[in-house]
């Protein structure tokens, strides 16, 4: 089977990393500050909460040109007698005649996507404000069998899911009146490898969600795949059969639990994307292949196609410049890598590592427990003991824990290069004060709540 990999291997190979960026741990979408917009969604109107049954919901995601809107049209014209409501960002994008919509018995709500940052205790979530209002309103009408939400091509699925589970100040939540049933992502079989390899920022294509949206196309594609229950591998008629298998197995490695369905023109049985009961938030959060690898769950069946993975663990910090050399020179066969890292120059802060195709980001993940004052540790003895389980040696829980997924990877060689990027025995002996003076070309980390000029190196 490896012989069949050759022709498509270059398309999946990310080539040299083209984008090395700093990214805040929670930065996934453009965010709005907590203002009057947040106060406006502090509670759901009582009349909206008066519903006899929960409204099941399917969310459609997919990059521009994947066939997501075609899937929506297929659902609307083959709804098998159900009374369906639809929420879309732009009516013009559906391109269905208004008379046909009326004949189909479909109610379409146009609600431009609007993000708002909400706080619940110490947890901060970015939610879809438009959905908080519209879904509750539709559910309160008690006349629909199903709701389909078509997200924009640059949307990530997780904020939608968080919108359903988030409890507002009065204790109400969308999940009280509607149930998130299925998260569907449509993938262009021909374009996926190419876009994954690119490091184009959405902003460079005029697609940014707003000021400060530094995501790349590759970041977005991976986010859409990793949080899906059902993935339509679309436009397979435009790709050689062997290459379709290769793309499917790559997606399977990124999200082992998703059901992958091959389609042409997004044609699929209604029951495969509606009423599946597949969505579970906790399961979805654990679905990404990199996280399953860290948890010891391997996906060996993809290895015959040259798709493999390995975990790198170490208990000494990276030298920033040697790590930078690895990132820009040695990751051409790596399609996805994720985890946390320890940089010698930023000894007290955990680094969050995320790479998708040709895009690499690194940002702060909070202080290591070993660098956290005892007063800020968990008060519960069992929780504190759990924290200490990660401690080893003089540097506590500081460590490298990274998962690499790629095609044609030489794991042994990559491990060797990563090991060479760690501090030497002599450098380790010099201690943290000496490490702080090492050259460090990585972008500075803007810590949570810090102002410009208060970055951490």
Give, region by region, the residue ranges found by the protein language model:
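N-terminal chloroplast transit peptides
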Residues: 1-19, 24
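Short, well-ordered alpha-helical microsegments
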Residues: 132, 156-157, 320, 411-414
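C-terminal accessory "lid"/substrate-recognition subdomains
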Residues: 31-48, 198-401, 411, 425-457
